[in-house]
Amino acid sequence: MKTFYTLAGILSLSEDEKELIKQQALEGDPVACYKLAEIYLYLHKCEDYVSSAHELLQKASEGGVADADASIAIMMFRGEIEPFDPVAAAKRLEKAINNGSDRGIAFQLRNLLYGRYGYKQNTDLVKQTLDQLLSQDEDPYWCALMGDFLMAEGKIVESQQWYEKAVAGGENSVYGDLALARGLNDDYSFRDYEAYNDTLMEGNDAMDPMCMYYFILDKIESYYDIDPEDTQARDEYRQMIIHALELNTEWCHPMTMELLGDIYREGQIDVPVDPVKAWGYYVHGSEFMHASCFGKMYDMLQTDEIQLGQMSNEEAMDLCMINGARLHDARLLVATVEAYKHGRLTQFAREIEMFHIPAYDAIPDDEPLDEEDEGPDDDGRFDAWA
């Protein structure tokens, strides 16, 4: 079942395997309903994938699949299920955990580790819980989470042993983390660049899209080392970067979508500025509930870099704000509350009054509210790379 907790696991499924799961789900098998829902949520390959996944998860939950309750709770926390109600989401998550959902336990541990979705950070409880789980069985899933814990604590070198165990057990989604652990010192300086790069290539073969993302970030820096007079070399290198990123978007990686948006919005690597393409990539990333994509869409609308035909820029900004607030983006949370105070977003009045205004009031006066203030969309892995 843990195959369906990670993008890398789902990407590795063959078309025949996915078709079999779909057939079993149509026949009413609750586990297959859960699996098919996760495929829809990760890959967005069916029309109206959110409502289709929700319906399948409800069937799986009724059939006793605890992980389905965890997935529903996650959708509720992210604002994919209306009305937005994080209190109800927390209760649904508690139900999943009480029924033995590994997915629910892992989600809760990450919330406590990174202080996400309104949970107060509690690394002591995370460590205690992981020690208990690993004393029973060194499951690769929990090994990966222990690696995440150590990485978040700044113990990059120590995290390597746990990521090694996770990968050895088939947890392919942590190759990007393993590359960092093999290559970096605790102060983020390189101790073995070759091991780092080799692991990225290994992880790319194992379908961890984070590996290609890290690899291309490195190549973007290298682009500027090419002699500007050598236009052919720069053209070929640029084409390689764009092609690799486009392939990675097919692996449903929202950080890659955001990066492509940045390239076209800012004209990086000598790409002609194209706000329409930039907007398209940010929209694609936002479909995966990637908070910073909502922030960049908001910025483009605010500065009139893009004009939408279907709705006014102000209406679109409202949608960006409320989604960002739901995802605990501090800057968009502030924008949401300020806009509401000026008579906008009234259709979300209950939600804003109950949840966003209290969160707004709790923000310290001296807290920075720029884009760097967002929560860790990649569980802190980009910070470790940087």
Predicted regions and their residues:
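TPR/TPR-like (Sel1-like) alpha-helical repeat modules
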Residues: A166-A168, V276-E287, S312-D329
